[in-house]
Amino acid sequence: LLSRRQRQMCIRDRSMTNEEFLKSLFWGKQRGTNREGYKLAAILLFGKEQTILNCCPWHRTDAIYRSVSYERFLHPLPTDPDIRYNDRDMICVNLIQSYIRLLNFVQRNMPDKFRLADNGIDRLDLRVMIFREVISNTLLHREYISSYTNKFLIFRDRVITENWTKPFQTGDIDINDWRTRTKNPLITKVFLSLIHI
């Protein structure tokens, strides 16, 4: 079921019940068997942890913070302490909760540079402005049938994201002939309505 917060963010037609909303977006027939049911996107977006792990046992995002530079991590000095990580969050919850936990992880482990808005009064959180896009992309453009663990790695000098995906094209990207393609359109549709992208 949808939480009250998810319901307020997702459902614009307030007269719809939770079940009507989920069926309107995520109900379909399975190819080959013609069995009807909810699509995996519904479970990944709104499911409870146990339901998600039953349907997609490899679904997780491993968020790791290391207080050293990336080069220092790859080539430590003999005098460096043996620190595997300073903070870690193994996230195995639905995508909406994953988004919130990853954003909290970024805010907890990355410095907040002071910046004022154009009006000169309001303070801007550049971390949120930048990383809501990065986090959304790592969650939206993942290949959810792959068992590869999604990784979100923060180092002192860079952030690295890793997720399994099948590219639509190979070779060089031509900026004059660039077209975006949605990897998971149902998940993207819900995230757009949540104003996370």
Please give the residue ranges for each predicted region.
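Single conserved hydrophobic/aromatic residue that forms the stacking wall/gate
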Residues: 1-7, 11, 195-196
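Conserved beta-strand-loop-beta-strand hairpin that lines the nucleotide-binding pocket
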Residues: 6, 41-42, 46-98, 126-194
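Extended, Lys/Arg-enriched charged tracts that mediate electrostatic binding to polyanionic substrates
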Residues: 12-52
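Long, charged, glycine-rich C-terminal linkers/tails
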Residues: 17-21, 117-124, 152-154
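Residues that form generic nucleotide/phosphate-binding pockets
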Residues: 21-24, 105, 190
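Structural motif corresponding to the C-terminal cap of alpha-helices
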Residues: 26-29, 106-114, 142-143
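Helix-hairpin-helix/helix-loop-helix acidic hairpins
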Residues: 91-120
